[in-house]
């Protein structure tokens, strides 16, 4: 199954996901370039990383958003978006031993359409655009060594779930996305590694 099929089979958690699912399916169906960042609306992924106790999450201090944030990035043509999420996790934090929790079609944990304001990146202006974002849930060990990715973030740390809300300076992401992820997490059995 591809991402279109995964999103089509995904059961929305709330009204935001129902509305965003429609937008994502239209883009995935109608825009062959949506996996490339050249498209005005393009596929991205995030990975919400928690410890085995589901009490802590791993966050990075994102330079563009000037906020503590979840981890993620662009598909950049790669249609195996779960592998992109794990790659971004390793690139942005150094964490290499996370496991994705299979909690939905294609292991999707959440989906959202995110607005991105115009900004500077690597000395060039990037116009405002949309991220067609899918989120994966992963489990990692807080004892695994972490590191920053200096061109993207200036900090990496594990925080208590409720602290993820207070340390984010992005009101919409905090109130609409992080709260949703925390609420959904309470209903997910993350299992134990064997």
Regions found by a protein language model. Give the residues of each.
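N-terminal strand-loop-strand
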Residues: 35-70
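Unchanged
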Residues: 75-172
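Charged phosphate-binding loop/patch that engages nucleotide di/tri-phosphates or the phosphate backbone
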Residues: 169-194
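Short charge-dense sequence patches
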Residues: 1, 32-42, 126-135
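Glycine-rich, flexible loop/turn motifs
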Residues: 30, 39, 71, 107, ...
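Generic N-terminal amphipathic, Lys/Arg-enriched alpha-helix
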Residues: 1-11
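Acidic, metal-coordinating catalytic segment for phosphate/diphosphate chemistry
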Residues: 9-46
């Amino acid at each position: 199954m591809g991402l279109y099929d995964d999103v089509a089979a995904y059961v929305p958690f709330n009204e935001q996901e129902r509305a965003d699912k429609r937008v994502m399916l239209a883009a995935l169906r109608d825009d062959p370039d949506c996996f490339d960042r050249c498209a005005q609306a393009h596929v991205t992924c995030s990975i919400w990383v928690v410890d085995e106790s589901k009490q802590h999450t791993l966050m990075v201090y994102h330079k563009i958003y000037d906020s503590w944030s979840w981890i993620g990035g662009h598909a950049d043509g790669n249609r195996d978006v779960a592998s992109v999420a794990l790659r971004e996790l390793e690139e942005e934090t150094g964490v290499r031993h996370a496991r994705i929790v299979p909690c939905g079609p294609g292991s999707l944990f959440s989906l959202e359409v995110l607005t991105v304001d115009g900004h500077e990146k690597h000395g060039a202006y990037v116009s405002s655009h949309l991220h067609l974002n899918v989120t994966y849930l992963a489990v990692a060990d807080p004892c695994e060594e972490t590191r920053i990715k200096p061109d993207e973030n200036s900090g990496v740390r594990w925080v208590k779930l409720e602290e993820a809300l207070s340390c984010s300076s992005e009101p919409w992401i905090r109130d609409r996305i992080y709260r949703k992820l925390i609420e959904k997490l309470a209903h997910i059995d993350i299992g134990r590694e064997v």
